[in-house]
Amino acid sequence: MKKKAFPAARKGRPPSEMAASHAAIMDAVYTLLQQKSVRDLTMEEVAKRAKVGKPTLYKWWPTKASLVLAMLCERMAPNLEKPTVLTAEASLRLRVRRLIDAFNGPFGKIVAGLIAEGQSELAIRQAFFDRWVGPRRAATIADLQRGKNAGELRSDTEPDLLNDAIFGAIYYRFLLGLSPFTRRFGEELVEQAIRGHRS
């Protein structure tokens, strides 16, 4: 009996092609979010602009929020990183300055949109914290703890409370649209918050 022939298994896409598709998708998300809100963005629009199939999107990112967060972490996060040789206070000032610059730029609208969506969607709120807020909060607290251990900050300083006092004020002004929201505001905020904690 003649054996039934089966089609050969399809090979995976070349890494270069996958990288090109990934870059096109990230570009599409960024561009579309300059024109509309996170809420109004659709996976169909992203797929069409990036010239990829919807199954490709859903294979890599199961939800719209995960896709937007991926773009945010890839495109915005590198601008927030800081050198490791700074003092705790200098590191804090740099983090504050870069975050304010980012929020005043095109990424600010995207972050605000994700936070707004997270108020009614627990999964979005949790993902935003896990991928965006949490790692940066932990890194800053670690910097402040390092400064405390090195004697830069007083021994009774609570790094987590100091961090939240500073960045809580930044998010407060950012989300409510309060002025001024400038580098100078950031410098004055850090000075007021850290003045009583210097050793």
Residue ranges and their predicted role:
Residues 33-36, 42-43, 54, 64-72, ...:
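Amphipathic alpha-helical segments enriched in hydrophobic/aromatic and basic residues
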Residues 101-109, 113, 123-150, 160:
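Amphipathic alpha-helical packing segments from all-alpha helical-bundle domains
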Residues 2, 126, 130, 134, ...:
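Hydrophobic/aromatic-rich alpha-helical bundle segments in the mid-to-C-terminal region
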Residues 97-103, 111-120, 190-197:
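Helix-loop "lid/cap" segments that line or gate small-molecule binding pockets
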Residues 1-49, 66:
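Basic, helix-initiating cap at the start of DNA-binding domains
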Residues 80-109:
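Hydrophobic alpha-helical connector segments
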Residues 72-78:
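Short, basic, alpha-helical segments at the C-terminal edge of helix-turn-helix-like DNA-binding modules
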Residues 51-61:
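Short hydrophobic/aromatic patch on the recognition helix
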